Amino acid sequence: MEFNMYDEKKLLGVIGLCRGAGKAIVGVPMICEHLRNTHEKRGEVKDVIVIEASDTSENTHKKINDKCAYYGVEIVRIAAGCEELGHALGKSAVAAVAIADKGFFAAVKKQLSC
């Protein structure tokens, strides 16, 4: 899926708001832990979307894709790189972020469908 810069900026803005509200899980290890814990507690993982940077390593890409496939979680690879995604989250570089809130999930899906 490709984005023009305007859509990408809006998407990164929504992701930044998620982080500010404490509804974003940042980094591959934290995402994997969240998916595992949520699955153990509820038996299913709902209203979670994982956003992966375009320049993640092959190993990271495989790891996050395998986890998302196992738990049935949607994953989207965006045009922004690790540095840009990290900047939107107030960090240096981030390979992936998960949105785990129903409202923000809907907002991110809306930006992805533009």
For the regions a protein language model found, what residue spans apply to each?
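Solvent-exposed alpha-helical segments within well-ordered globular domains of core cellular machineries
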Residues: 13, 33, 62-66, 87, ...
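Short basic, glycine-rich beta-strand/loop surfaces that mediate nucleic-acid
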Residues: 72-114
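Feature captures the catalytic cores and cofactor-binding loops of soluble hydro-lyases/lyases
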Residues: 45-46, 56-86
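N-terminal first-folded block
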Residues: 7-52
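Short, glycine/charged-enriched secondary-structure capping and boundary segments
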Residues: 40, 64-67, 91-92
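Conserved residues at beta->alpha junctions
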Residues: 54-55, 99
